[in-house]
């Protein structure tokens, strides 16, 4: 299960990604928002991040206009490594080297087709472990 959330600026892209993943047989749990009415991204980003951190969802996708605010929010939740990506290479490398468990995107930065490629790359790339695990452990130790 994939946690997904957005604010008003990311609502349309969130709905597009939900439909795209559903067509591929991937289930999403939507943590809001449910319209383009102005709202506060920390509310929705936090809810999705908590679902990933608790194990309720395997990974998460969060979207706002730039992706910046909602990624900062998600990264405040212990156990979350949320990467803001605007290209497939970043999505690949953050999974391979950082074991990112959440993806943030900016709806004003990436269009639907690019977002699909970024999401596919993020969800289908495995963590390499090895020397990268040591680095992820050092990051995680900072949360204590």
Where are these regions (language model features)?
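N-terminal beta1-alpha1 ligand-phosphate binding loop
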Residues: 1-17
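A short beta-strand-loop structural module common to alpha/beta enzyme folds
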Residues: 27-38
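Patatin-like phospholipase
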Residues: 12-16, 23-26, 43, 47, ...
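Helix-adjacent hinge/juxtasegments
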Residues: 44-84
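C-terminal binding/interaction regions
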Residues: 5, 9-10, 88-144
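A general structural signal for well-ordered alpha-helical segments in protein cores
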Residues: 14, 41, 45, 71, ...
């Amino acid at each position: 299960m994939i946690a997904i959330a957005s604010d008003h600026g990311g609502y349309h892209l969130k709905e597009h990604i939900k439909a795209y993943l559903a067509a591929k047989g991937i289930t999403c749990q939507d943590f809001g928002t449910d319209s383009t009415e102005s709202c506060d991204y920390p509310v929705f980003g936090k809810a999705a991040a908590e679902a990933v951190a608790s194990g309720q969802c395997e990974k998460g996708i969060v979207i706002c206009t730039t992706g910046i605010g909602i990624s900062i929010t998600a990264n405040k939740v212990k156990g979350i490594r949320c990467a803001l990506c605007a290209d497939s290479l970043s999505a690949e490398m953050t999974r391979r080297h950082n074991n990112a468990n959440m993806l943030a995107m900016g709806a004003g930065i990436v269009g639907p087709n690019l977002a699909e490629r970024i999401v596919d790359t993020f969800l289908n790339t495995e963590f390499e472990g090895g020397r990268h695990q040591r680095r992820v452990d050092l990051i995680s130790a900072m949360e204590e």
